[in-house]
């Protein structure tokens, strides 16, 4: 006779593994929308929200051309040098798509993504890697995307 607890755990594991998989179609669809527009030069604001030392620098204004970051400045004019490597890791739309893809693959505890309806880029990404760790959530918020010539 099977124990109810074992059945519950099996069902819970199946449900949780399906959560990440259910987000992959939206990722694929929106990434295709973004890529279909062949946007090579753009500027946007990025706010990274977390319990991090750089919160006063947010949002960043980032300009990207041909996949390369050509400028990145803090909204308050502060020095971003100490955090440059961290910021560069998520400073292109392509890298934000990769971040979502990685979170889905890793089956993080919670992943909430909202995509821009016109361009398809991830406008809001909130990741909570672990249910067991408090205050480890990170949010990435893209605003004011401007396509440049």
Task: Give the role of each language-model region.
Residues 48-67, 71-73:
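Short, surface-exposed binding/anchoring microloops in extracellular/periplasmic proteins
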Residues 68-108:
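A short-motif feature that recognizes glycine-rich, charge-decorated loops
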Residues 1-8:
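Bacterial N-terminal signal peptides that target proteins for export
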Residues 37-49:
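A short, Trp-centered hydrophobic/proline-enriched beta-strand micro-motif
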Residues 54-59, 108, 135-138:
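Short, surface-exposed coil-to-beta transition loops
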Residues 16-18:
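C-terminal motif of bacterial Sec signal peptides marking the signal peptidase cleavage site
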Residues 122-140:
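Short, exposed beta-strand-loop hairpins at the edges of beta-sheets
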Residues 20-23:
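Bacterial signal peptide processing site
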């Amino acid at each position: 006779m099977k124990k109810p607890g074992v059945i519950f755990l099996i069902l819970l594991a199946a449900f949780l593994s399906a959560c990440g998989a259910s987000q992959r179609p939206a990722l694929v669809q929106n990434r295709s929308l973004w890529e279909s527009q062949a946007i090579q030069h753009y500027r946007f604001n990025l706010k990274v929200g977390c319990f991090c030392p750089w919160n006063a620098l947010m949002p960043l204004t980032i300009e990207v051309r041909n996949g390369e970051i050509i400028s990145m400045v803090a909204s308050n004019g502060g020095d971003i040098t100490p955090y440059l490597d961290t910021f560069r890791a998520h400073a292109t739309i392509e890298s934000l798509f990769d971040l979502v893809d990685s979170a889905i693959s890793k089956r993080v505890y919670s992943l909430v993504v909202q995509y821009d309806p016109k361009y398809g880029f991830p406008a809001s990404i909130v990741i909570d890697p672990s249910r067991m760790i408090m205050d480890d959530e990170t949010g990435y918020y893209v605003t004011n995307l401007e396509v440049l010539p």
